[in-house]
Amino acid sequence: PEYRPTVIDTAVLARRLVRDEVPNCKLSTLASRLRLDHSPTHRALDDALATTDLLHVLIERASGFGVLGLDDLVTLSKLAGHPQAAKLTMTTLLPRTPGVYMFCGGRDEVLYVGKASNLRQRVRSYFGGEDRRRIATMLREARQVRHFELPDPLTAEIVEGRLIARMLPRYNRAGKRADKYCYVRLDAAAPWPRLAVVKEPSPSGLHLGPLPSRTMAGLVIEAFHSALPLRRCSTRLGAGYQPPPGASPCSSAQLGASQCPCAGLADAAGYARAVDTARRAFQGDPTAIVERLSARMGELACAQRFEEAALARDRLSALLGAVRRDRLLAAVRRAGRCEVRRGEVAWTFDAGRLVDVSVAGTAGRALPADPPPPPADGRPVGRALVDEALCVAKYLDRNAGQLEVVSCSGVWDFPVAADDALPRLV
């Protein structure tokens, strides 16, 4: 294997740690001013010995910034110049293990919650390459860092989501993102069904979601409309609807892109076939729509209409992503209560909720945040539960080949089958 040693640049470290004590950071100047045991003579051995002496001095100085290991020293060149570098002492007691960290303000309020595979390394990184404006403001307010040490990154991600949902920290945008969740709904039982964006699923109708934004839901609907002549108007059409005399068709119908039953210009049999194709996509089989959209995308690309082809690609990507999320959530719910093991860590899930985690040789441990409650009978699934179930489902799907299923009360469907079109189109 290729030899790739860890590199420590003593010149950069010296500029960060002793720049105010010396006129320049030449090795000869540093050796003289810091009274090193060896002086450089432009000969390999003497210069190497002087550099080693300098490194020992810099390591001693670096300890004042909370440097306790090689990884800390490697990143110090970035950290020491940060406006809030003095607060690096808040990271001194953080372990190099998975967990959840919380930046807290002067009144002990939680400002920001995050997860990490290596708590110490992740928290210290905020004082280096992090350039988001809101994080800079948060660091100015932070007075301490609290943490929960957890057995693995999956548990850390789940606990992070629970804490954000419970505390709604000011600097966590993820905590506010759930309010934007929405669904695409098809009321297939209604006369002349149409697609709509709704905030919550209802007992009747078919739904795709939850989707992260109305923009994404709009792209999904556009994907259906690009492939199927479903009506786009919002007119309520009951079983006995009669179009008013002289009603004019909507613009999409005039262009031949959709049927228009509200103006009496629709073929019931053809419309029923389009609804049946849409229903199959909602139930997890978007093959017909994928084929039509991919063919349309190819035609546009061949005609050098690349912007329109890119829009068709985005619509198709949104549709496949929505179907994929739906499949993952359905799979984790079908699994019921199951115990899964990877290495020394074992998790117990109940319909996508993490209810217990243990490490080999130890009893199950209480988590810092309780799981979201299961949905009441007949009520839509809560957003916190959806987030956690989706997190679990993605992990099980991604790592299915490395997991040992100890028990499962339902049906184990991981890895979830992907559409053949997904790898080449998304």
Listing of model-derived features with the role each one plays in the protein:
Residues 11, 28-29, 222:
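Short glycine-/small-residue-rich flexible loop motifs, especially phosphate/cofactor-binding loops
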